[in-house]
Amino acid sequence: EAKEERESSPRPVFRAKTVAATPREAPRPKLDHIMRLTDDVGIIQHAKFIVPDRRHGYCTDDNARALIAALMAQDMIADNKAVTSLSCTYISFLHHALNEETGRFRNFMGYDRRWLEETGSEDSHGRAIWGLGEAVALATSEDFRAAAGNLFENGLRALTNFTSPRAWAYALIGMHAYLRQFGGDSE
């Protein structure tokens, strides 16, 4: 009898739209601010409202993140030349940041284009590896992918001596992205 009653008047079930069930559509990115902050060296660390604050110069962390953002935007922006130009600027900064003698990325550069240290933090190195791994995965140009892959590989060796869990986490995210593109690479 209880079964018949339950079948004849079932309890209402609450069904809210969830993130998984709702199609996700991000708004088209606007590059005006990132372009304002970027010069021929890289992206400037800070701004006062919309004005780049040159007193703080540049850092590897921000250029690695800007590289990821630019490459993620490449399919959503009509002006692909601007995105390509930004991406090339950011990877060029990372190339210059790698100290080939130590295998480590420098982090801070003054607006006068002088490095403020010979070796950056482990965290900034991890973020550089993250950015380069994503660049390998997201690049549409084989030449760009090769440049990112070369820098990525040159920065890996230093990770073996790191003690920062955060640096390792960023590097692992970059390795995961790299392996999405080159899944069979075991070196």
List PLM regions with ranges:
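Low-complexity, Ser/Thr/Pro/Gly-enriched N-terminal "stalk/linker" regions
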Residues: 10-65, 69-72, 76-109
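Generic hydrophobic, helix-prone segments enriched in Leu/Val/Ile
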Residues: 33-34, 128, 158-159, 171
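Well-ordered alpha-helical scaffold segments within catalytic/enzyme domains
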Residues: 65-82, 127-143, 170-185
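A contiguous, low-structure linker/loop signature
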Residues: 96-137, 141-146
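Hydrophobic, well-ordered secondary-structure segments
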Residues: 149-156, 168-176
